[in-house]
Amino acid sequence: MAEKIPKPVSKRLVSYYMCLERLLDEGVEVVSSEELARRLDLKASQIRKDLSYFGEFGKRGVGYNVEHLYDAIGEILGVKKEWKLVVVGAGNIGRAVANYTVMKEKGFRIIGIFDSDPSKIGKEAAPGLTVSDVSELEKFVEEHGVEIGVIAVPAEHAQEIAERLEKAGIKGILNFAPVKIKVSVPVENIDITASLRVLTFEIVRRNS
């Protein structure tokens, strides 16, 4: 797709997909942009603008066919493809990710987990998933065609791991380390502490 899609649009696209999934479960066949906006606390014009990046989906005065739009957005998001992942870092976060079974149900299959700690190497991190030495990371990624790397290492090691993953052919990175990493592949940063700070700010502001 030639046109560059703003990152906020991609995030909202995921919300649209999940909302449409719920609508299908409810047996809804047609939905308007106004109803989607109400459910997602957005403006209908924003939804229409976001969807226009990818083509024409609805009819003015009629709305969107829920199943058709759900399938179309799913295709855009790559949900029908099974994605291979590796986790680097077998600490609490890394093991939690490896044991999150919902990921496999949604098409994300973790096929390897790596660490540099000798006390963790060779131990089971999740059912059927044994911790490997991080020195084997590049070879594993290349041999298995891994597409997504999950970084769950201390901040001081995150950039190095990201660069190694990129050189090995990783297509995207999910970063749990509390530091921004710089690589040419797409990166999604998950900073739990930062999110909690935003939450506490809202709590304090609401109760002041």
From Swiss-Prot:
Residues 15-54 bind DNA. Gene3D superfamilies: NAD(P)-binding Rossmann-like Domain, Winged helix-like DNA-binding domain superfamily/Winged helix DNA-binding domain. One of its GO terms (cellular component) is cytoplasm. The keyword Transcription applies. Signal peptide: none annotated. It is found in: Cytoplasm. NCBIfam families: PRK05472.1-3 (NF003989), PRK05472.2-2 (NF003993), PRK05472.2-3 (NF003994), PRK05472.2-4 (NF003995), PRK05472.2-5 (NF003996). Homodimer. Belongs to the transcriptional regulatory Rex family. This is Redox-sensing transcriptional repressor Rex 1.
